[in-house]
Amino acid sequence: MAFDGVVIANIVYDMNRLLTGGRIYKIYQPEADELLLVVKNNKETYRLLISAGASLPLIYFTTKTKANPMTAPNFCMLLRKYISNGRIIEITQPGMERIVEITIEHLNELGDTCRKKMVIEIMGKHSNIIFIDEKNMIIDSIKHISNQVSSVREVLPGRTYIAPPGKGKISLNDLSVEWMENTLLVKPVSVQKAVYGSISGISPVLANE
């Protein structure tokens, strides 16, 4: 299955249905690029696995358990500090991009209510899990990307979070008959290539279907 924007939209729908309003009970980091969130909601317990692996980035519910390191990695410890027992407020997908944003409400050291956001970018070798504050500042990420690695954007603690650059495609949510007649159907390529090249969230596999 191609992990495109359409597939992610369905996953986000299920995540909202099952997790919104729930409490983050446990946070694990079984692999260097992988998180497991255990969420309790409506008397049920859900296990959400998030992988930012370069070869197979995924986000899905699981019933399986994995061995965890004896000492939790720094990113895992930081998440536990901020959002253990935090409440999931909403889960969104910007446009039809391969991005999932989980908004979490928690109490700070003074007992004040704060919100943080976990941004999950499912983008092949560029996949990442980024933790940001209410001002869109990066607190930390599971992968640090310096300007020596990427000239497009840095992903480092203290930097402002900037979403991955778009490709100028239209969202599925914004399609119209007029746009299709004036843009899609006049392109000098196959319908499959026109769909994939013009509409965000569509993979080549889905465009072919």
Identify the role of each PLM range.
Residues 1-6, 151-155:
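Short N-terminal secondary-structure initiator segments
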Residues 3-67, 71:
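A structured, charge-rich N-terminal accessory region that forms the first stable segment of a protein
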Residues 42-209:
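Phosphate/anion-contacting hairpin/loop surfaces
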